[in-house]
């Protein structure tokens, strides 16, 4: 189930991501390596995330997964319809926009996005019986997915400067990481911005004697 969901996530929600990747690459063998590596890395990390949620959360994990697919569908709609990037500033706009204002950005195509890319996967998630297996199997599957992710990262060490250069755009097109990570970043920035300044007490002379500072 987790592998199916990972493949579906890669294919259904990441066409804008790979379109941007290909537009930033010069092509050739190295470009093919980067593109393939990103696809494998996304499969491994999403598999790890889905498996961890389902095994540890059971029904609650299914609910969280269902929410992420609906959120993925909504995010993809805005990316395709309005060519936006899901950054921390974008998430700030989302949280500070009233429903009456936000409803004007939705159209009939948004309903289709949510239905086919959100609701139908949710039905599959809740109707599919999950074989959780043993804890040993859990550790094995989690370990394999992490090993694949680390291996891909190590193989592409020479390509990390390119990834770092395009990190903002790439991260804003990744599902479900774009809105989850940038939501945390937004609230973290808001917390720092709204933190009250702690004033120190007024300076005073502790003794009446005259001291000489050298």
Sequence positions of predicted segments:
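Transmembrane and membrane-interface helices of multi-pass
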Residues: 1-173
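Membrane-interface segments at or immediately adjacent to transmembrane helices
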Residues: 156-214
């Amino acid at each position: 189930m987790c592998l199916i969901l990972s493949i579906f996530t890669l294919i259904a929600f990441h066409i804008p991501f790979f379109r941007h990747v290909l537009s930033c690459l010069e092509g050739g063998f190295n470009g093919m390596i980067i593109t393939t590596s990103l696809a494998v890395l996304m499969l491994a990390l999403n598999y790890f995330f889905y498996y961890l949620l389902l095994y540890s959360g059971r029904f609650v994990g299914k609910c969280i997964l269902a929410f992420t697919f609906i959120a993925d569908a909504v995010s993809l709609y805005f990316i395709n319809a309005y060519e936006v990037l899901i950054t921390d500033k974008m998430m700030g706009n989302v949280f500070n926009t009233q429903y009456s204002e936000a409803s004007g950005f939705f159209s009939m195509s948004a309903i289709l996005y949510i239905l086919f890319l959100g609701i139908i996967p949710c039905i599959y998630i809740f109707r599919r019986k999950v074989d959780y297996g043993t804890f040993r199997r859990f550790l094995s599957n989690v370990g394999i997915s992490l090993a694949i992710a680390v291996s891909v990262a190590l193989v592409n060490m020479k390509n990390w400067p390119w990834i770092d250069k395009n990190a903002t755009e790439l991260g804003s097109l990744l599902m479900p990481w774009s809105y989850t990570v940038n939501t945390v970043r937004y609230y973290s920035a808001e917390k720092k911005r709204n933190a009250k300044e702690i004033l120190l007490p007024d300076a005073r002379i502790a003794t009446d004697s005259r001291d000489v500072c050298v």
